[in-house]
Amino acid sequence: GAAEYGNKLNLTFDEMDSVITQGKELGIYLYMFTGGEPLVRKEDIIKLCKKHSDCAFLAYTNGTLVDEKLCEQMVEVGNFYLAISLEGFEAVNDLRRGNGVYGKVMHAMELLKQYGLIFGTSICYTSKNIETVTSDEFVDLMVEKGCRYAFYFHYMPVGNDAAVELLPTPEQREEIFHRIRKFRQTKAIFSMDFQNDAQFVGGCIAGGRRYLHINAKGDVEPCVFIHYSNANIHDCSLLDALKSPLFQAYHDNQPFNDNMLRPCPMLENPDKLGEMVKESKAVNTDYQSPETPEHLKEKAAPYAENWTPTAEKLWNEEKEKIEAKKNA
């Protein structure tokens, strides 16, 4: 899938339409919108859903713009799904997302459920909220509200102003590894952990292996969290972007680690990203506050080092389980 994104979501309808048209020729039928807030462009998104009825579209949203009209349009098109961002219960959520947002999210979920629509939640877990968002109470509430899936994202220390203290500890990450696996067996919701479930997709899927990201300016990036690029959709085709030096470097280096609990070239293998950026001469795409790969590595390296022993232990246990199943 490809994703389009930006603070002002300022790719035009025609530009997004062109990306999808080109994508379909390459076999891409899943498109995601992130933000900013993609639902400020809901009319354009619905138009894209109608025009490309053979594709599935998903928006990551704060949920505040969900109303009856949108629900009716979603029922009509049948190929648009939502992942509503939550950080926890009301007090924690509104601290990050603004007063009153939690109440609006609950209302949005009630509306979507009433219309029989498929939706879920998107949760960024940090050292501060990890206990809450993996509690039975929280997950049970999501099930009750009608969520069919929960996408758990590990906090990424991207950007010059990133707060490294929000990175989960090895103990916390080990705990969420076990809890989400338990939820998949016991809760009526499909839970995915984007950092701890790499074993099911053979490691990092970015850089065009199974996924890429296009920002608001049209820069084609390997991943929503990796702000480096050699290609822009205004200057080249999607296929050319997939052949760009940084994407080729991803292709040549994946998987970045044989340990599937250390999949990322930034977070768990921080040397890798710098090497690929240097080798591909990719430029930084964060125009407001460009960050060097060296600065990013400084933040990720201590985390990677601390996580490695736990990752090795857990991955060895997983491999034993896989072997046991094979031999059963």
Description of each model-found segment:
Residues G1-A3, K24, L238:
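N-terminal pre-core extensions flanking Radical SAM catalytic domains
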Residues G1-F13:
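Canonical Radical SAM [4Fe-4S] cluster-binding loop centered on the CxxxCxxC motif
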Residues A2-Y5, F89-A91, P157-N160:
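A short, flexible beta-alpha/helix-coil linker loop
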Residues F13-T34, R41-F153:
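Radical SAM/AdoMet-radical enzyme domain recognition
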Residues C55, D94-G207, A216-K217, E221, ...:
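Radical SAM enzyme [4Fe-4S]-AdoMet core and its adjacent flexible, acidic
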Residues F225-A328:
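Flexible mid-to-C-terminal extensions adjoining Fe-S/redox cofactors in radical SAM and related proteins
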